[in-house]
């Protein structure tokens, strides 16, 4: 699945949102915490654990793990604390605990930035100095859910692969083991 001009995250976010609205239970397999913002009644995260296994994360797990009111606040959390894996700068000197405290106090990054007069001392200075980085991080952390693409359930049904097309692709990519495993032969086409 792809849509020209859009990131894969945004396509996944849009399709997960559409599936949720249709009442279809959907799992997103990813270790990326920014996908937590997409979790909804019918959308869960299937997160690989270090060392093996998986955790299934729903709304309650996000709220408990991060101490926030809604999964959508993952965006606010990342905007403040940053994310080195995804290159979100955040607000220097603000870690997860402080970010959660600020989100719970102000409700959102937007409210925080409108209410910096309520901050004191070093925290006020940190937020004021990092306003643009916080806004950029918020933008970067937000996974779009409005990509012009439709959830086509018929197209997503599992079908037997076209052996000839698959053989050509595996040959082009030099996937000899997969050719043998899925096509039962190691010969080239």
Segments the model singles out, each with a brief description of its role:
Residues 1-150:
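Extended two-metal-dependent nuclease catalytic cores across DNA- and RNA-processing enzymes
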Residues 129, 139-189:
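Low-complexity, acidic/Ser/Thr- and charged residue-rich accessory regions of DNA metabolism proteins
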């Amino acid at each position: 699945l792809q849509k020209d001009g859009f990131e894969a995250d945004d396509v996944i976010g849009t399709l997960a949102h559409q599936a949720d609205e249709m009442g279809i239970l959907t799992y997103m397999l990813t270790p990326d915490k920014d996908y937590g913002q997409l979790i909804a009644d019918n959308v869960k995260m299937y997160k690989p654990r270090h060392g093996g296994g998986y955790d299934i994360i729903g709304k309650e797990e996000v709220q408990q793990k991060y101490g926030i009111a809604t999964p959508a606040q993952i965006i606010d959390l990342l905007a403040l604390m940053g994310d080195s894996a995804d290159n979100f700068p955040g607000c220097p000197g603000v870690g997860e605990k402080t970010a959660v405290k600020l989100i719970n106090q102000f409700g959102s990054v937007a409210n925080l930035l409108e209410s910096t007069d309520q901050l004191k001392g070093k925290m006020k200075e940190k937020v004021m100095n990092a306003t643009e980085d916080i806004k950029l991080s918020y933008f970067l952390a937000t996974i779009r859910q409005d990509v012009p693409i439709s959830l086509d359930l018929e197209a997503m049904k599992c079908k037997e692969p076209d052996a000839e097309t698959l053989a050509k692709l595996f040959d082009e990519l030099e996937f000899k083991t997969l050719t043998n495993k899925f096509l039962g032969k190691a010969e080239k086409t």
